[in-house]
């Protein structure tokens, strides 16, 4: 509904790990797609301030790159957030599309990334940054093939060693190692992320499944997959966790039904 699209909910997940030296509260944003909650996203920023996070993490798709060249909305939002908090950003397919479709976007990707880094944002392109000694945040750029529309061809499996080639050897379970958060836009490959060693994967991309049906979950993803289990929510594999956000915006299929936009608060607690 139109009402839902403009009224986000704040949802809390707690994660406990012996790898952490201290407790932290993190905000996770995803899939804004140029949506605005109040002027210049004032309502979203105010809600984040009320939660007093230690850092803000973004999982990508903060703009709409479908022939449009508008990056003003996310830049205004991140300028406000970076003035108050450490900010860590990974890419989604819409950020990456500016690279994949150079003929259309020119240097817009570099313009966006450079504006973000000038604000002090940690911009993670197949790279890592730390938040203290005990918390490491990685951003994974997935190749275009992993975002194929399932109507036309099968979505590919992730080849063995893909994450190692992109990000190097994964973390171990040793509690002396930092707790590793992976910003990986698509939740489809959670098995690979967990196998690589990410303690917590943060994903979005599926917009909660567009329409959510009680007992069944999300109906359809932007890749035209139906009733996938991980359209949104909290998942576990062999002690590794994944949080999939319903996102904050929409684009081509501008519908949200029983599927409010979501601001995620993650409470990391030391075991």
Predicted regions located by residue number:
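Beta-strand-turn-beta hairpins that frame and shape the catalytic cleft
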Residues: 14-27, 121, 128-139, 236-241, ...
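Binuclear metal-dependent hydrolase catalytic cores centered on His/Asp/Glu-rich metal-binding motifs
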Residues: 99-120, 128, 132-180, 190, ...
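N-terminal membrane-anchoring alpha-helices
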Residues: 1-20
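Active-site-proximal beta-strand elements of phosphoester/diester hydrolases
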Residues: 23-33, 134-146, 181-184, 241-246
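Solvent-exposed loop/turn segments at secondary-structure junctions
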Residues: 34, 62-65, 93-97, 143-145, ...
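Active-site neighborhood of phospho(di)ester-bond hydrolases with catalytic His/Asp-centered motifs
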Residues: 28-30, 55-61, 86-93, 124-126, ...
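Conserved beta-sheet core of the metallophosphoesterase superfamily
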Residues: 186-264
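Membrane-embedded segments
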Residues: 19-122
């Amino acid at each position: 509904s139109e009402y839902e699209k403009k009224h986000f909910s704040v949802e809390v997940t707690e994660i406990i790990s012996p790898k952490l030296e201290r407790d932290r509260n993190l905000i996770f944003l995803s899939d804004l797609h140029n949506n605005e909650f109040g002027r210049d996203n004032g309502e979203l920023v105010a809600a984040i301030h009320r939660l007093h996070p230690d850092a803000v993490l973004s999982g990508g798709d903060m703009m709409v790159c479908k022939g449009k060249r508008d990056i003003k909305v996310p830049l205004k939002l991140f300028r406000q957030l970076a003035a108050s908090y450490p900010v860590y950003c990974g890419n989604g397919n819409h950020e990456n599309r500016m690279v994949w479709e150079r003929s259309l976007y020119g240097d817009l990707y570099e313009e966006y990334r450079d504006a973000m880094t000038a604000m002090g944002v940690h911009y993670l392109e197949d790279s890592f940054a730390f938040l203290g000694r005990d918390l490491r945040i990685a951003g994974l750029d997935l190749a275009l093939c992993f975002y194929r529309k399932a109507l036309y061809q099968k979505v590919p499996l992730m080849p063995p060693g893909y994450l190692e080639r992109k990000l190097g050897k994964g973390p171990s379970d040793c509690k002396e190692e930092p707790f590793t958060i992976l910003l990986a836009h698509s939740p489809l490959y959670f098995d690979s992320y967990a196998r690589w060693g990410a303690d917590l994967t943060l994903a979005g991309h599926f917009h909660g499944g567009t329409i959510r049906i009680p007992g069944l979950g999300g109906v359809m993803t932007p890749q035209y997959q139906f009733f996938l289990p991980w359209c949104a929510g909290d998942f576990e594999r062999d002690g590794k966790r994944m949080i999939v956000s319903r996102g904050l915006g929409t684009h081509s299929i501008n519908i949200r039904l029983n599927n409010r936009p979501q601001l995620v608060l993650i409470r990391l607690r030391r075991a």
